[in-house]
Amino acid sequence: MAKCEKGYLCAVCGKEVEDLIDSELYLRYTVGWLDPEKLHIAPERHLMCNPALAQFINDERFSELKVPSEADKQQLDAEFVAKRTELLTRGYRRLVELQQAGESVSITDYPLPEAAARYRLGG
């Protein structure tokens, strides 16, 4: 993360979210679930501290999570799970790319193309 992006504390465990690839906040922003205008006031969490969301990341660099009972993706509609997994996995892979690029990427370039297009249109 850029220096200005460091210091976010996890709303669940209270520890600093040190790396972009651990950030639920930036994953939500990258996939288009968080308005850029709310990025600085939205709560942050480690991805691992939100297993209900993190279970949809399907990447060898991310630890697989088991989620208790009704929140487990195995209990959800297969089409919903497939779409959510595709989106959040792409978002996570984008965070990996961004972290590898270092501070050379503008925050306005973080979102996936379809999210960036929605943000530009104001919706």
Residues of each region from the PLM?
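Short, charged surface segments at domain edges that flank catalytic/cofactor-binding sites
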Residues: 1-3
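Short recognition patches in nucleic-acid-associated and regulatory proteins
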Residues: 5-38, 59
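Alpha-helical structural elements
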Residues: 21-24, 28, 41, 51, ...
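Short microdomains enriched in Cys/His and/or Lys/Arg
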Residues: 30-45, 67-77
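Short metal-binding segments enriched for Cys and/or His
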Residues: 36-64
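Long, contiguous alpha-helical scaffold regions
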Residues: 62-123
